């Protein structure tokens, strides 16, 4: 199989193909958060649901955007990110909660 085939085929885990996602994709871990973000989009459409990976694609202020859940932990996130890149995602932004051990980071701080 050539790399061109890999990039044009439906991806096994996220169940999407090229054209299903916008160039910018938000990736929360929790699948429940995807519907919250979809409610903030214009023209939101559910394009896939497979295992922990749920995706909506729409627009925000006229800009195409997608939101795909990845589940918890590094392995499913890595799988999701690799497959999203194969089908055209260019900007992937992880959103959600995290922990920190630095004393200057209090609950509620935004970490980028």
Regions found by a protein language model. Give the residues of each.
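Metabolite-binding pocket within alpha/beta catalytic cores that recognizes anionic/polar moieties
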Residues: 2-112
């Amino acid at each position: 199989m050539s790399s061109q085939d890999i990039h044009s085929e439906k991806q096994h885990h996220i169940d999407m193909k090229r054209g299903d996602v916008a160039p910018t994709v938000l990736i929360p871990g929790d699948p429940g958060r995807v519907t919250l973000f979809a409610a903030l989009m214009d023209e939101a459409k559910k394009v896939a649901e497979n295992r922990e990976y749920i995706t909506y694609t729409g627009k925000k202020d006229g800009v195409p955007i997608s939101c795909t859940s990845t589940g918890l932990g590094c392995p499913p996130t890595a799988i999701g990110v690799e497959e999203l890149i194969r089908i055209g995602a260019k900007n992937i932004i992880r959103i959600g909660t995290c922990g920190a051990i630095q004393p200057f980071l209090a609950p509620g701080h935004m970490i980028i």
